[in-house]
Amino acid sequence: MTRLVLGSASSGRLKVLQQAGVDPLVVVSGVDEDAIMAGLGPAATPADVVRVLARAKAEQVATTLTGQQASVAADCLVIGCDSMLYIDGRLCGKPETVDDARQLWRSMAGRCGHLYTGHSVVRLTEQRVTHRDDETSTTTVHFAAPSDDDLEAYLATGESLKVAGGFTLDGLGGWFITGVEGDPSAVVGIGLPLTRDLISRAGISIAALWASNPLP
């Protein structure tokens, strides 16, 4: 019975999986994302950046499980994810301040950006890594142009500081999204179609995943 482990503190990713009928064990990685990005250098593509970050998260969680939760590491699949918005030639993670979020939203208003989401899986069998795989999905997000009052009210909620690109599709920010080209679940943080492919390549069916990780 393969346990699914989500290596992320993202409530959005957890919600996507739970709405898809899976209740994963959550183990947060705590990797140093800034150090990893600095190591990649300026030549790294957006797709590579989020993929490498997702891989680092999945591998760190797998290492933690092997050392601290042997019963889980006996048969589990760890999935790590990372999302970033690419617009105006730069990758944007979570804004650090409200002013950063304000400037980002002003640059996005009435335009579109590309949301890159890296997905990485590590399968553990008897405390050993038996499979690794990773891939990136890309989704185009079209933004509305919120009024100054609406933007300030949104920024005051604090939501924009918690998510990559300073926006959500499934939360308060959804009011200011006019369309999505690609997988909506990837915009929330974990793409179900790509995750299904990665899980399948690890030798696990969705039926088995449902059976091993039922909702309470």
Curated annotation (Swiss-Prot):
Active site residues per record: 82
Cofactor: a divalent metal cation
SUPFAM superfamilies from the UniProt entry: ITPase-like
Listed GO MF terms: nucleoside triphosphate diphosphatase activity
Location of the protein in the cell: Cytoplasm
Record function comment: Nucleoside triphosphate pyrophosphatase. May have a dual role in cell division arrest and in preventing the incorporation of modified nucleotides into cellular nucleic acids.
Superkingdom of the source species: Bacteria
Protein name (database record): Nucleoside triphosphate pyrophosphatase
Catalyses which reaction(s): a ribonucleoside 5'-triphosphate + H2O = a ribonucleoside 5'-phosphate + diphosphate + H(+); a 2'-deoxyribonucleoside 5'-triphosphate + H2O = a 2'-deoxyribonucleoside 5'-phosphate + diphosphate + H(+)
Similarity comment: family membership: Belongs to the Maf family.
